């Protein structure tokens, strides 16, 4: 298992223990009341992305043309401008500030 006390969590798409803030892309919560962030962890070919949401189970989305979706999930990820954006039920919830890697 992962050493949670050292900040490690299991990543399904990477198949290893990771520290999400070290390898993930941080998404800022657009709700002005909340300061919690979400993180995106991509697999090697970016065909799958694991979403780490505060307080929720991880969600794995699969690339579909220019976005990532999961059947039966309320979440989707897209690239808008130079940012990743996370939608829940078609409402924009999170946005990255660091830009989209090339």
Task: Name what the model sees in each region.
Residues 7-8, 49, 83-84:
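Generic short beta-strand
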Residues 76-102:
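C-terminal partner/receptor-binding element of secreted or periplasmic proteins
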Residues 20-69:
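Mature extracytoplasmic domains of secretory-pathway proteins
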Residues 8-15:
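Extracellular, cysteine-rich, disulfide-stabilized repeat modules with beta-strand cores
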Residues 15, 47, 66, 82-83:
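Beta-strand-connecting loop/turn residues
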Residues 66-73, 101-102:
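Short, surface-exposed linear segments at secondary-structure transitions and domain or protein termini
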Residues 1-5:
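Disulfide-braced loops of extracellular cysteine-rich modules
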């Amino acid at each position: 298992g992962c050493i949670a006390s050292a900040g490690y969590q299991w990543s399904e798409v990477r198949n290893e223990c990771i520290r999400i803030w070290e390898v993930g892309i941080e998404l800022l919560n657009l709700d002005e009341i909340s300061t919690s962030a979400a993180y995106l962890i991509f697999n090697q070919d970016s065909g799958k992305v694991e979403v780490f949401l505060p307080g929720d189970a991880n969600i794995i989305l699969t690339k579909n043309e220019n976005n990532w979706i999961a059947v039966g999930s309320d979440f989707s990820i897209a690239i808008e401008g130079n940012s990743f954006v996370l939608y829940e039920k078609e409402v924009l919830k999170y946005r990255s500030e660091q830009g989209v890697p090339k």
